[in-house]
């Protein structure tokens, strides 16, 4: 018996006929069988199953067939196939339903009919008790079916597949996710469809983002289709990142595809598979990218993609661009370059003009002006690279290149000649008349450099017009004040410092908060201060030395005694010699007192002396009126204290200025002082130089004009000013300077200010000692040609110091010093040669004057001529400043004496000058006496030897002429006339006989030597 099947598997038949012996013949694959074959197979099957087959004499009924259960199963399958192609009633478009039905039918047919490569073709039933021969019937059926269906083929070779264990696969996943997270890479999860994910930074942390459809311009109801395995893999990858809670308000444009794990967002939101993928927001609620929404919601909701950001930027940009487009363009605008290149050029210009990390970053908006206006080399280098990029890669944008070039040129317009601006302020800063005010205004405008505006240029042009009209109209008026009515009391009220009254700059204890200023103040502490270790004691810091002397600090009082008597002794301090108020204590301009630049007095006009200033630790003490203010220093080490280096105590003034500087300007302020101001000032500068530095800082940082200064003590004996720090002063009796703010200190800058104190050093050299030593050196070198030559080579202007005494000038003229100077300086340095000629002419006139008063008047007449030659000095050295100081004093003394004489007053300074001349002459005569003594000794030794030779060579009795010559020579040599007792030894032998003495007694060698020694 044989049976043909369309989709029946051989295994089913094997189960049915499990106990029988079968012979199976492979047949063709039924996947490609057509409908006719299937129909014929069905009819054959039904004929076998429903009709009894007669084999010989016996009938075989349906119940007797061994494959009756198989018939029932095949019948049900055939019934299903019969109705397989029928169309179901569905809603929707006809064409779409038809296409879907055809596709589904093909899939189900292929799934139904596709079986294994072999089916049962022939079944052999062994003989039973009923001997039935079914061979013929089965062969007929098989022959009819195999003509179309039988196709023999070799069975496929099964390939063995190797599978990784679950633990190894997990390790591979873990390593892959670690690499993706560290390198911010893109990962693709592939199943039936691929899902892409990327890693990027979001709100300060690294997060996982999935690629969704709306990011590529597609608006679908389901933004991300993902199967379960991909969701599990994506969740496993998301677990590698920190599960931080995300603020709902921070989810905006650019957060599309953000994968949030359950717990990182509010519990009220919907999750699936333990995570939430951001799509956008609809009616204030976030939408998951995997959720299915309606078409209306899909097109009305706000998607949080980066493309939305670009649209939000470009659409307003395009709208405003068209709105501001200029009228009257002479040509028709066409697209000549691509929009992409225009965007690239716009990005280059943005980074060149306003460098930032994001155009929406507010912090970049605040810091960018400082970067653009600054002069950092990194900023200029970056802008130069961008300009080179424009030239090389974008030559079709010449307007962008020209714009950036002009910007860099404008930025490089910086005025570096600070000395000229300061000199202008020193020369005419105190004059309030035209044209001096115009010159000062032009100087300040030019100092601005690249910060100039159009209004500044117009103002400068106006001032230059006024200068051109009034440049030659210079006048100077000076009046002498009287100290009898001078009063300069200090205020008992404390100065109001706005910087210390702002609550934002004070802590909970009311102390000043340095902020960024304290961080940048380290440039002062490290470079110009010395650390004090309290563990080592304070003894070595008590004596504060300077070149002129020393004073004692009160730092030793930090170690206090519990004995009240000892404490009372410490309060008294150690006083110096106290000086009264004099001209050295005042400052005048245009005949009026400049009170801030004068010493403080009491109500009766007497000087107010300093008392003991108590020490403190780690403080900056400011304020001169009322109670001082104590600010905590921004120390580097809480256990250390700091004291200014010797010669740099003026750094406490700059520390006080830093209090009023803005925090954003503190870095430039401290660097400018460290790199520019301090190298110019050096150690122990003059007060005028310190005031000039403060004036320069006030131009760049106007807030420092209101800054309070530390206390300043004046030591008139040593011509020194002491800027006090927190360690006070144990030495008392100094005068006190009244100035309290920076604007008052700047008054010392003006050259028209008449004050001795502006030349005082904030620490420094003793100028009086230096001047006296230079004069002594000049006197010593008059009769030492080698020493004079060395002085003329190293310090040529030292010869001007000779005008302090007419005797020194005459001695230098007689010794040939001026002639030696002329030979040395001609023709290379005509200025010095002219100066030597002037001094030589003055010395010639002094030799003709008999009276000392006449000699002084001649020197005063030549003082102005000498000063004019000194102003144009070609060498800068120490002797030049000393010479200018002495000549200036001569001129000032002459003018004051003249004013007194015109007023009817008697001038008593002549006696002082006579006494000074006698003092100098004593030293000069002592030097000359030593020189004469040496000359006499050398002369006497020479004549002694000559006379001894003559006494032996000639006979005095026979050679009378030679005797007379001998006596004449001795008389001239020893300057002793023969008629005197000293000349008795020179008389003739005849004279000695009359006196009763023999010639041997007179002219023996021994007696002659004694007489010669007596004459010497």
Curated annotation (Swiss-Prot):
Effect on the protein upon substituting residue 649 to S: Complete loss of proteolytic activity of HC-pro
KW Transport (keyword) present: yes
Domain of life according to the entry: Viruses
Enzyme class: hydrolase
Composition bias type Basic and acidic residues, residue spans: 997-1007
One Gene Ontology term, aspect cellular component: host cell plasmodesma
Pfam families linked: Peptidase_C6 (PF00851), Peptidase_S30 (PF01577), Potyvirid-P3 (PF13608)
InterPro entries attached to this UniProt entry: HC-pro (IPR001456), HC_PRO_CPD_dom (IPR031159), HC_PRO_CPD_sf (IPR042308), Pept_S30_P1_potyvir (IPR002540), Potyvirid-P3 (IPR039560)
Keywords attached to this entry: Host cell junction, Host-virus interaction, Hydrolase, Inhibition of host innate immune response by virus, Protease, Serine protease, Suppressor of RNA silencing, Transport, Viral immunoevasion, Viral movement protein
Occurrences of domain Peptidase C6 (ranges): 641-763
Domain description: The N-terminus of helper component proteinase is involved in interaction with stylets. The central part is involved in interaction with virions and the C-terminus is involved in cell-to cell movement of the virus.
Chain positions of site Cleavage: 304-305, 763-764
Organism, as annotated: Tobacco etch virus
Domain Peptidase S30: 163-304
Family: Belongs to the potyviridae P3N-PIPO polyprotein family.
GO MF annotation terms: cysteine-type endopeptidase activity; serine-type peptidase activity
Renumbered ranges of motif Involved in virions binding and aphid transmission: 615-617
Matching PROSITE patterns: HC_PRO_CPD (PS51744), PV_P1_PRO (PS51871)
Outcome recorded upon mutating residue 256 to A: Complete loss of proteolytic activity of P1 proteinase
PTM: Potyviral RNA is expressed as two polyproteins which undergo post-translational proteolytic processing. Genome polyprotein is processed by NIa-pro, P1 and HC-pro proteinases resulting in the production of at least ten individual proteins. P3N-PIPO is cleaved by P1 and HC-pro proteinases resulting in the production of three individual proteins. The P1 proteinase and the HC-pro cleave only their respective C-termini autocatalytically.
Involved in interaction with stylet and aphid transmission, short sequence motif: residues: 358-361
Effect after changing residue 694 to S: No effect on proteolytic activity of HC-pro
Gene3D superfamilies on file: Helper component proteinase (3.90.70.150)
GO biological process terms on file: proteolysis; symbiont-mediated suppression of host innate immune response; transport of virus in host, cell to cell; viral translational frameshifting
Region (Disordered): 997-1016
Protein name: P3N-PIPO polyprotein
Documented EC number(s): 3.4.21.-, 3.4.22.45
């Amino acid at each position: 018996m044989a049976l043909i099947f369309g989709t029946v598997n051989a295994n089913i038949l094997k189960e049915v006929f499990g106990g029988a012996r079968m012979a199976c013949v492979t047949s063709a694959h039924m996947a490609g069988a057509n409908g006719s074959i299937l129909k014929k197979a069905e009819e054959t099957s039904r004929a076998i199953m429903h009709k009894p087959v007669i084999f010989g004499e016996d009938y075989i009924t349906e119940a007797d067939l061994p494959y009756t259960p198989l018939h029932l199963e095949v019948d049900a399958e055939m019934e299903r196939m019969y109705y397989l192609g029928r169309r179901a009633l569905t809603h929707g478009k006809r064409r779409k339903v038809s296409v879907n039905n055809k596709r589904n039918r093909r899939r189900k047919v292929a799934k139904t009919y596709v079986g294994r490569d072999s089916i049962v073709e022939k079944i052999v039933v062994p003989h039973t008790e009923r001997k039935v021969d079914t061979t013929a019937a089965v062969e007929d059926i098989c022959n009819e079916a195999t003509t179309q269906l039988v196709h023999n083929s070799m069975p496929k070779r099964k390939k063995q597949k190797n599978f990784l264990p679950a633990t190894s696969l997990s390790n591979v996943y873990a390593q892959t996710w670690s690499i993706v997270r560290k390198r911010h890479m893109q990962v693709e999860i592939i199943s039936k469809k691929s899902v892409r994910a990327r890693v990027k930074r979001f709100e300060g942390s690294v997060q996982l983002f999935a690629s969704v459809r709306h990011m590529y311009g597609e608006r679908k109801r389901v933004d991300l289709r993902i199967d379960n395995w991909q969701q599990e893999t994506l969740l496993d990858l998301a677990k590698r990142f920190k599960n931080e809670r995300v603020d709902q308000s921070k989810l905006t444009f650019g957060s599309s595809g953000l994968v949030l794990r359950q717990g990182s967002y509010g519990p009220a939101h919907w999750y699936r598979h333990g995570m939430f993928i951001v799509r956008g927001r609809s009616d204030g609620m976030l939408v998951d990218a995997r959720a299915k929404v309606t078409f209306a919601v899909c097109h009305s909701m706000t998607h949080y993609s980066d493309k939305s950001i670009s649209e939000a930027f470009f659409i307003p940009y395009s709208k405003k661009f068209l709105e501001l487009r200029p009228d009257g363009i002479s040509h028709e605008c066409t697209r000549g370059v691509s929009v992409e290149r225009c965007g690239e050029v716009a990005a280059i210009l943005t980074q060149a003009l306003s460098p930032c990390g994001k155009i929406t970053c507010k912090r970049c908006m605040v810091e960018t002006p400082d970067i653009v206006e600054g002069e950092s080399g990194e900023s200029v280098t970056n802008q130069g690279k961008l300009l080179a990029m424009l030239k090389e890669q974008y030559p079709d944008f010449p307007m962008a290149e020209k714009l950036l070039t002009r910007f860099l040129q404008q930025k490089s317009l910086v005025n570096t000649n600070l000395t000229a601006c300061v000199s202008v302020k020193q020369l005419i800063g105190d004059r309030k008349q035209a044209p001096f005010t115009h010159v000062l205004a032009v100087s300040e405008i030019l100092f601005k450099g690249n910060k100039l505006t159009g209004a500044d240029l117009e103002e400068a042009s106006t001032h230059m017009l006024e200068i051109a009209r009034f440049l030659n109209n210079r006048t100077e008026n000076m009046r002498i004040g009287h100290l009898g009515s001078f009063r300069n009391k200090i205020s008992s009220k404390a100065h109001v410092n706005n910087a210390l009254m702002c609550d934002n700059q004070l802590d909970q204890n009311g102390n000043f908060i340095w902020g960024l200023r304290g961080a940048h103040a380290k440039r002062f502490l490290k470079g110009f201060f010395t650390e004090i270790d309290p563990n080592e004691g304070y003894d070595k810091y008590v004596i504060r030395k300077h070149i002129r002397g020393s004073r004692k600090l009160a730092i030793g009082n930090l170690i206090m005694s519990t004995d009240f008597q000892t404490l009372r002794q410490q309060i008294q301090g150690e006083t110096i010699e106290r000086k009264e108020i004099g001209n050295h204590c005042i400052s005048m301009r245009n005949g009026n007192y400049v009170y801030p630049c004068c010493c403080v007095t009491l109500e009766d006009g007497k000087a107010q002396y300093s008392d003991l200033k108590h020490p403190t630790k780690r403080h900056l003490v400011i304020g001169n009126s009322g109670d001082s203010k104590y600010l905590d220093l921004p120390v580097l080490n809480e256990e250390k204290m700091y004291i200014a280096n010797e010669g740099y105590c003026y750094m406490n003034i700059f520390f006080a200025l830093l209090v009023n500087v803005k925090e954003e300007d503190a870095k430039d302020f401290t660097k400018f002082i460290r790199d520019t101001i301090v190298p110019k000032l050096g150690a122990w500068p003059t007060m005028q130089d310190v005031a000039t530095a403060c004036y320069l800082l006030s131009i760049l940082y106007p807030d420092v004009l209101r800054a309070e200064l530390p206390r300043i003590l004046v030591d008139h004996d040593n011509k020194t000013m002491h800027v006090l720090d927190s360690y006070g002063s144990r030495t008392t009796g100094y005068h006190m300077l009244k100035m309290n703010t920076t604007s008052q200190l700047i008054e010392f800058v003006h050259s028209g200010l008449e004050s001795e104190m502006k030349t005082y050093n904030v620490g420094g050299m003793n100028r009086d000692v230096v001047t006296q030593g230079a004069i002594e050196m000049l006197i010593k070198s008059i009769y030492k040609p080698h020493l004079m030559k060395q002085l003329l080579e190293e310090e040529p202007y030292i010869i001007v110091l000779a005008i302090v005494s007419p005797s020194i000038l005459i001695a230098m003229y007689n010794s040939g010093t001026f002639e030696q100077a002329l030979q040395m300086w001609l023709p290379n340095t005509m200025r010095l040669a002219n100066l030597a000629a002037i001094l030589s002419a003055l010395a010639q006139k002094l030799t003709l004057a008999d009276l000392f008063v006449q000699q002084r008047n001649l020197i005063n007449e030549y003082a102005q001529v000498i000063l004019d030659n000194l102003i144009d000095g070609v060498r800068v050295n120490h002797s030049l400043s000393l010479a200018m100081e002495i000549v200036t004093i001569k001129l000032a003394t002459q003018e004051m004496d003249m004013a007194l004489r015109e007023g009817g007053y008697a001038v008593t300074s002549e006696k002082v000058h006579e006494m000074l001349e006698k003092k100098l002459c004593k030293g000069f005569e002592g030097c000359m006496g030593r020189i004469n003594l040496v000359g006499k000794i050398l002369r006497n030794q020479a004549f002694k030897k000559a006379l001894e030779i003559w006494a032996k060579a000639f006979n005095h009795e026979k050679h009378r002429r030679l005797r007379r010559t001998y006596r004449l020579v001795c008389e001239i040599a020893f300057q002793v006339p023969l008629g005197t007792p000293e000349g008795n030894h020179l008389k003739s032998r005849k004279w000695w006989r009359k006196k009763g003495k023999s010639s041997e007694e007179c002219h023996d060698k021994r007696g002659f030597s004694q007489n010669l020694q007596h004459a010497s």
